Amino acid sequence: MSKFNRIHLVVLDSVGIGAAPDADKFFNAGVADTDSDTLGHISEAAGLSVPNMAKIGLGNISRPIPLKTVPTEDNPTGYVTKLEEVSLGKDTMTGHWEIMGLNITEPFDTFWNGFPEEILTKIEEFSGRKIIREANKPYSGTAVIDDFGPRQMETGELIVYTSADPVLQIAAHEDIIPVEELYKICEYARSITLERPALLGRIIARPYVGDPGNFTRTANRHDYAVSPFQDTVLNKLADAGVPTYAVGKINDIFNGSGITNDMGHNKSNSHGIDTLIKTLQLPEFTKGFSFTNLVDFDANFGHRRDPEGYRDCLHEFDNRLPEIIANMKEDDLLLITADHGNDPTYAGTDHTREYIPLLAYSVSFTGNGLIPQGHFADISATVAENFGVDTAMIGESFLSHLK
């Protein structure tokens, strides 16, 4: 019998809690990640007031220096710890796949200086369209169409760009490059990025409409992902008849593998929280696992190195945390964590190699305190033990510590 009938995992994308032991092997603009500390530096630089997460025990997590503006709790309402990444990567897919039990020993490729000519030339030859070379670098999806959309409307050239994650994105105005044509180009790009030197996690079609100065991306986005290289705990759950619900980009990250119910993409963190709450309220969701990603921390503030915006985004989530808890049942477990760091005060614009926080809360808890420090995959091992399924590659359950 399950200890908890429902478990809800919420990933606050990029909310790291201090440099990992191997941070010296990961870099931002030539600077090692050894001094990165997403939550710590936001707390110092911008101030951080998150009373609801603090009440669970966020400020009690072991750190060399306590969070400046997040107090410790003498009697927290939950259990907390920090977790270390084993896998060789600090991207979204690697983090999430490890959280679900995999050890990624060959990281995906990222292209901070843009894609090599070999890739661009192949796409040009297949599509019969030129590629705007100036866009070939990590770029904000809205900024890239603002900057190059007018040129695309005149020339029909493709806008190919990337991000901090191992993705290749192609933006196309729907009136200039029909959506079906864009999809075919992206399918081809997927076929040539399945191995080194360009092993990518996703190819993303990014259609948009409108006029210069007023472009908007449409709902015709399509992701061409790769499935995890072996079963995750999501697959183990689905195979055992335990429903799995994906909120936000979780379905894309796992290419639908092990997902029985996709609740759709998030328009924003707030929209994602709305969707999570609707998921919690589903009459048929009496047992199972929900998995939510809230990406605004990372996409809107981490990469843009905006500590004040990041702080406000954390405040927004914390303010809505009581709503999530109010929709939980007594035999529900809430787990709040992250997938990597993205220190908005750090060098460069890339993710940072950090520990991730873990907050565990249930109405049924009679105890509280610290969970032994472990690794990302301990989350999936805990979920697996709770529902009586096998673990994946790695992970040690902390279920027995939750009382």
Curated annotation (Swiss-Prot):
Function of the protein: Isomerase that catalyzes the conversion of deoxy-ribose 1-phosphate (dRib-1-P) and ribose 1-phosphate (Rib-1-P) to deoxy-ribose 5-phosphate (dRib-5-P) and ribose 5-phosphate (Rib-5-P), respectively.
Cofactor note: Binds 2 manganese ions.
Domain of life (superkingdom): Bacteria
Record: residues binding Mn(2+) 2: 298, 303, 351
Name of this protein: Phosphopentomutase
Family statement drawn from the similarity comment of this UniProt entry: Belongs to the phosphopentomutase family.
Gene3D superfamilies: Alkaline Phosphatase, subunit A (3.40.720.10), Phosphopentomutase (3.30.70.1250)
Annotated positions binding Mn(2+) 1: 13, 339-340
